[in-house]
Amino acid sequence: MTTHLVWFRQDLRLHDNLALAAACRNSSARVLALYIATPRQWATHNMSPRQAELINAQLNGLQIALAEKGIPLLFREVDDFVASVEIVKQVCAENSVTHLFYNYQYEVNERARDVEVERALRNVVCEGFDDSVILPPGAVMTGNHEMYKVFTPFKNAWLKRLREGMPECVAAPKVRSSGSIEPAPSITLNYPRQSFDTAHFPVEEKAAIAQLRQFCQNGAGEYEQQRDFPAVEGTSRLSASLATGGLSPRQCLHRLLAEQPQALDGGAGSVWLNELIWREFYRHLITYHPSLCKHRPFIAWTDRVQWQSNPAHLQVWQEGKTGYPIVDAAMRQLNSTGWMHNRLRMITASFLVKDLLIDWREGERYFMSQLIDGDLAANNGGWQWAASTGTDAAPYFRIFNPTTQGEKFDHEGEFIRQWLPELRDVPGKVVHEPWKWAQKAGVTLDYPQPIVEHKEARVQTLAAYEAARKGK
């Protein structure tokens, strides 16, 4: 008998799952599913408790949905990726598996694991799929057959390649001929978990699909105008579903073009399409530059920057007590919800690196430990952009002024007051510099003074980068 095994990883859905669809194509084959939890590996990768809670809930939903299709989900738990190789081998042997199907992951440890799995399964046909990207790594290259290092040329080539042949979404599998089965007992991950707002980050696959549809209908067209203002619900909040594979990027693309067909030609919705392409860009980058997965900067000379070791400054940044309201409100949003508005991710990252001169890798790790949408490629790409260490990054002399950023993107301080209750009585725009208002009003605020003076910090940071660039 032909037995197909689908190995689920970051693709916890039935719809548009390339590996699952391929495994179910042969109607006479027996189909099994497998998920391997690796708690120690997750801890090494700083996976957040909220993301673990989301995965736990999605796994249980997936187990029920697969059972309705007649596909049992086998759950196993081992320490790390190395141990998971033996588990796959064991499951294949116990169930006389003839074919293994899985969707590629592009991070360096995951790729090494998959190489070892295929090496161990000499008598099993292994098929991998580029499921977590719209266009696979290698499909968009320069004329010299190299990976693009600048986003805009990559985007233009990506769009040209997409117009030549757009990948379709595949349907969810039909019920197997053997009929539905009873699902196994509920899964509980052996990893710290923390609750989150399921209204913003849906657990069920159909709810995530509905959220995508609603955003593309009502939000994508206005995304360009609203995306930078954290007090406005102007972003999609789909990042968590994409990070865990509750949605596919192809689903996002097709729904966007169904609702905003002009997005492909620079019209309404095109700016959100750019965000999907940035996601592709960072995934392609880590495939061709695996050192990015090992905490190495893309621009080599930036590794010579003399970062400050200041645990006290790092802690107040993490806690949202720097004395800069927009930075502190953003960090408290992150700590309270597991999510942060994208404009604020840039502001807080710039502040840590270029006002406090703290190594960007400290921020990268902390974000991953808190984010429900933690994604190595996107998080690393964002931090290296802010720190001017990455490909196509902001130039090192571009340093955000946290006060003017707050004034520009939270003009009346609505977002700040939402997350900093100690500033709720500070009126109007002066909330961006509350220490000045308090001094004039003769009021004592339960809010810290700025931990650094921005102009002085800027001078210090420029000197540190310039010394590194010159090799001093």
What are these regions (language model features)?
Residues 1-166, 268, 463-468, 472:
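Trp/Phe/Arg-rich N-terminal binding region typifying the photolyase-homology
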Residues 46, 314, 445-448:
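Short coil/turn segments at secondary-structure junctions
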Residues 233-422:
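Active-site-proximal binding-pocket segments
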Residues 145-299, 409-410, 414-472:
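Glycine/tryptophan-enriched, flexible segments
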Residues 21, 90, 206, 328, ...:
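A broad detector of short, well-ordered amphipathic alpha-helices
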Residues 51, 55, 319, 323, ...:
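Residue-level preference for long, well-ordered alpha-helices that form the structural scaffold
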